């Protein structure tokens, strides 16, 4: 099977099928480079993998046994929630393949370099998208629907008159500063030639492009608007704490020009999950002649080619010895350059081994922990907002109600993203640690508590929406049952959650009690052994003294 591979010399060996490696593979193969790509895994995707329900449960069991430094898969909590206690298990009742759990969900801007590259490379032929319908951010105990256009800002119930004026003026100032391609025929206000009512903010922005964005915002806005700007418009992460006003404006401009391209929000989400990106690029690479080896039983040894000759077309700078444990076959390939995913370099038990003489340029930076929790709901979400999603939530650190030490992101998926069955919806909560977090267990316990608290807040907000909007005809038409029935269903889910939490606490107490008893028994046993040993030593000592006395008597005699 592998004999033909040994005859060729490859320009590149790419190890890994993560997003970066897949994009490089597609680009290099289109540029006529000969390459071979391998991944020591059961499937494509790296940390962008998707799992169905059964595979997800297997994956969780595997990660319990073996920890990894890959920040995206550090800890995953799979929590299935049934509305009715007498329901059959989800895995038997429904088609488990209709679930797509996305380890590392990714959006793309509707108008950006990423979308242009996907279209130009024709990788978009292999991916289908849906738009994110609403973006919320949590301020105190409320989820605010973030307005982006002039009309949305004016009708927003979440902002007072002064806040509306300031936010609109800020958005217009950013567009005036960054928009070099004015479209007078655009139907979107912010893309036209903008005349500002007040130039003060624009002038301040222009003068202070190199100062920290946070310092600039604190001078001009309240906490609510600052969170809205940084978390939503600028898409802030923990790595953007020191960004300048100029960098912030670039991010916001990128956000704003993508609004109303396909929907009211700028984000597109791939159907079936983020693994579609890597698979589309891998297909594109394969179409242009790349060879792929995806096998979790491969091992590699990489060495310099001592017989390398520059003019020899069949000789590469590196010789890679590969062992296929499944077929029990060994073979060698020649390559001039090697690109490898950092996870293989960071893992001490990596199946990829380098000769000590080879110098490796490792671009890995500080890693973080990421906690993901998945909550699957039956009926409730469907009754309220069927096919209205997906929805995206962002919660800043230290929210007054949630009291979260870490930033929280959440996505609510519906069947229109092909990630859940028709009669279900999926809430995915992701919490990322700070760079200085060095205690994994402490982080996981805190993140778990935060995600459960956030779930309760989501459920309470749904309940409030029902009470507030039920008389609205459009809203009412989405509901299959009456209001009382829906509220009963929500209360039942919350009771289930409380019951589960109580059972977990009791189980934890029981385990701690058993552990304490075991430790006490061990301590008692240890003391008894020590006393026994001490007694034996004393007896031995007494025996020796008696013998000495006897010997002495004998001598005297």
Residue ranges and their predicted role:
Residues 102-112, 202-209, 260-287, 293-295:
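Short beta-strand to alpha-helix junction loop
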Residues 82-246:
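Mobile amphipathic helical/loop "lid" adjacent to a hydrophobic cofactor/ligand pocket
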Residues 267-269, 279-288, 296-448, 453, ...:
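Mid-domain catalytic core of redox enzymes
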Residues 20, 24, 43:
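Conserved Rossmann-like nucleotide-cofactor binding loop
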Residues 498-552:
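Long, low-complexity, compositionally biased polyampholytic IDRs enriched for Lys/Glu and Gln/Arg
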Residues 398, 449-497:
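Flavin (FAD/FMN) cofactor-binding core of flavoprotein oxidoreductases
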Residues 4-20:
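Beta1/beta-strand and adjacent pyrophosphate-binding region of the FAD-binding site
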Residues 13-15, 29-55, 64, 74-75, ...:
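Glycine-rich FAD pyrophosphate-binding loop
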């Amino acid at each position: 099977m592998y004999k033909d591979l040994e005859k060729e010399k490859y320009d590149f060996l790419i190890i890994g099928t993560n997003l970066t490696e897949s994009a490089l593979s597609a680009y290099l193969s289109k540029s006529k480079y000969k390459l071979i790509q391998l991944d020591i895994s059961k499937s494509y995707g790296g940390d962008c993998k998707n799992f169905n329900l059964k595979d997800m449960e297997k994956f969780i069991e595997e990660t319990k046994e073996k920890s990894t430094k890959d920040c995206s898969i550090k800890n995953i909590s799979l929590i299935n929630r049934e509305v009715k206690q007498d329901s059959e298990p989800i895995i038997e009742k429904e088609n488990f393949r209709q679930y797509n759990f996305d380890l590392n969900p990714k959006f793309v801007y509707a108008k950006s370099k990423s979308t242009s590259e996907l279209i130009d490379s024709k990788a978009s032929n292999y991916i289908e998208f849906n738009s994110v319908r609403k973006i919320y951010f949590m301020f105190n105990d409320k989820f605010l629907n973030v307005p982006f256009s002039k009309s949305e800002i004016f009708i927003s119930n979440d902002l007072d008159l002064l806040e509306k004026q300031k936010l609109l003026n800020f958005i217009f100032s950013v567009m005036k500063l960054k928009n070099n391609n004015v479209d007078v025929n655009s139907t979107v206000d912010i893309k036209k030639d903008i005349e500002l009512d007040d130039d003060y903010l624009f002038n301040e922005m222009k003068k202070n492009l190199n100062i920290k964005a946070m310092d600039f915002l604190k001078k001009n806005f309240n906490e609510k608007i600052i969170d809205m700007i940084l978390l939503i418009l600028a898409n802030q992460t923990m790595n953007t704490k020191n960004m300048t006003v100029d960098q912030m404006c670039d991010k916001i401009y990128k956000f704003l020009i993508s609004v109303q391209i396909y929907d009211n929000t700028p984000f597109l989400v791939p159907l079936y999950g983020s693994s579609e990106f890597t698979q589309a690029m891998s297909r594109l690479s394969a179409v242009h002649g790349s060879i792929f080896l995806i096998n979790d039983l491969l091992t590699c040894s990489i060495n310099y080619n001592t017989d390398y000759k520059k003019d020899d077309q069949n000789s590469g700078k590196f010789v890679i010895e590969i062992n296929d444990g499944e077929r029990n076959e060994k073979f060698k390939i020649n390559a001039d350059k090697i690109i490898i995913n950092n996870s293989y370099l960071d893992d001490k038990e990596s199946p990829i081994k380098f000769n000590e003489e080879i110098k490796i340029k490792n671009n890995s930076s500080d890693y973080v922990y990421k906690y993901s929790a998945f909550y699957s709901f039956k009926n409730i979400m469907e009754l309220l907002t069927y096919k209205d999603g997906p929805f995206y939530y962002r919660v800043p650190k230290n929210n007054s109600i949630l009291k979260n030490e870490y930033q929280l992101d959440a996505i609510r998926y519906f069947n229109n993203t092909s990630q859940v069955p028709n009669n279900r919806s999926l809430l995915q909560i992701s919490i990322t640690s700070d760079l200085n977090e060095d205690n994994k267990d402490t982080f996981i316990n805190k993140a778990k508590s935060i995600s459960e608290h956030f779930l309760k807040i989501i459920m309470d907000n749904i309940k409030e929406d029902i009470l507030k909007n039920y008389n609205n005809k459009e809203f009412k038409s989405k509901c299959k049952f009456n209001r009382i029935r829906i509220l009963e269903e929500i209360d039942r889910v919350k009771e289930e959650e409380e019951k589960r939490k109580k059972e977990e606490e009791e189980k934890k107490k029981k385990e701690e009690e058993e552990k304490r008893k075991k430790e006490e028994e061990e301590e008692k046993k240890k003391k008894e052994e020590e006393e026994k040993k001490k007694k034996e030593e004393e007896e031995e000592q007494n025996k020796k003294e008696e013998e000495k006395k006897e010997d002495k008597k004998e001598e005297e005699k």
